Swiss-Prot record:
Domain of life of the organism encoding this protein: Bacteria
Classification via HAMAP family: GreA_GreB
Coiled coil: 12-76
The protein's role, per its UniProt record: Necessary for efficient RNA polymerase transcription elongation past template-encoded arresting sites. The arresting sites in DNA have the property of trapping a certain fraction of elongating RNA polymerases that pass through, resulting in locked ternary complexes. Cleavage of the nascent transcript by cleavage factors such as GreA or GreB allows the resumption of elongation from the new 3'terminus. GreA releases sequences of 2 to 3 nucleotides.
Protein name per the record: Transcription elongation factor GreA
Keyword Membrane: no
Source species: Clostridium botulinum (strain Kyoto / Type A2)
Length: 160
């Protein structure tokens, strides 16, 4: 039997997942139960789109609850005090020079469960995140990405 996947996370990431889990269990479940009650009051379920929609939403929420519980149960929280501040790790804020676009970009390296590329939070498992892990200021890395190879120089490493 394979071992459960460990989810590398920052303390902040764990807190956000715990808050989402609490919201889904306490607020969202009640909302959906009410929607189902209202839909049932309409009678015939064979053509009751409100009922179908509420049951689909319930299935999605219950699936997300199971997913969050699993992620939290298997979380591996990065202790930022144990990692040198000048080495890129999960929890680092890294400023890099992107040679392809000739611009400076700042990334926050997070576990895959916390990744949010729109807010420059990249996973330690992504090509760029993986390439940056363990590096320090002045290092130049080349990363294979879907479009080819990207080249970055690490300009700054800070803690989130």
């Amino acid at each position: 039997m394979s071992e459960a996947k460990k989810y590398v996370m920052t303390y902040e990431g764990v807190k956000k997942l715990e808050e989402e889990l609490e919201f889904l269990k306490t607020v969202k479940r009640k909302e959906i139960t009410e929607k189902i009650k209202v839909a049932l009051s309409f009678g015939d379920l064979s053509e009751n789109s409100e009922y179908d929609e509420a049951k689909n939403e319930q299935a999605f929420v219950e699936g997300r609850i199971i997913q969050l519980e699993n992620m939290l149960k298997n979380a591996s929280i990065v202790d930022e005090n144990e990692v040198p501040k000048d080495i890129v790790s999960v929890g680092s804020i890294v400023k890099v020079k992107d040679y392809e676009f000739d611009e400076e970009v700042e990334y926050i390296i997070v576990g895959s469960a916390e990744a949010d590329p729109m807010n420059n939070k990249i996973s330690n498992e992504s090509p760029v995140g993986h390439g940056l892990i363990g590096k320090k200021v002045g290092d130049i890395i080349e990363v294979t990405v879907p479009d080819g190879v990207s080249k970055y120089e690490i300009l700054e490493v800070n803690r989130a």
